Amino acid sequence: MGDLSEADSMKHQLQRRDCGRCGLGQICDAGACRPSTMM
């Protein structure tokens, strides 16, 4: 577990909001839903 920078945190929130259709623990990559392997 590393320290999340302010920018990374904001980016993550934007990704989550942009991909609300994705399930929890998933990330949006190029408009596609992918399981988040980084935790």
From Swiss-Prot:
Processing after translation: Contains 2 disulfide bonds.
Proregion positions: 1-15
Tissues with expression: Expressed by the venom duct.
Signal peptide: none
Keywords carried by this UniProt record: Disulfide bond, Neurotoxin, Secreted, Toxin
Domain of life: Eukaryota
Subcellular location as annotated: Secreted
GO molecular function: toxin activity
Transmembrane segments: none
UniProt comment concerning the protein's domains: The cysteine framework is XIV (C-C-C-C).
Entry protein name: Conotoxin Cl14.7
Lineage: Eukaryota, Metazoa, Spiralia, Lophotrochozoa, Mollusca
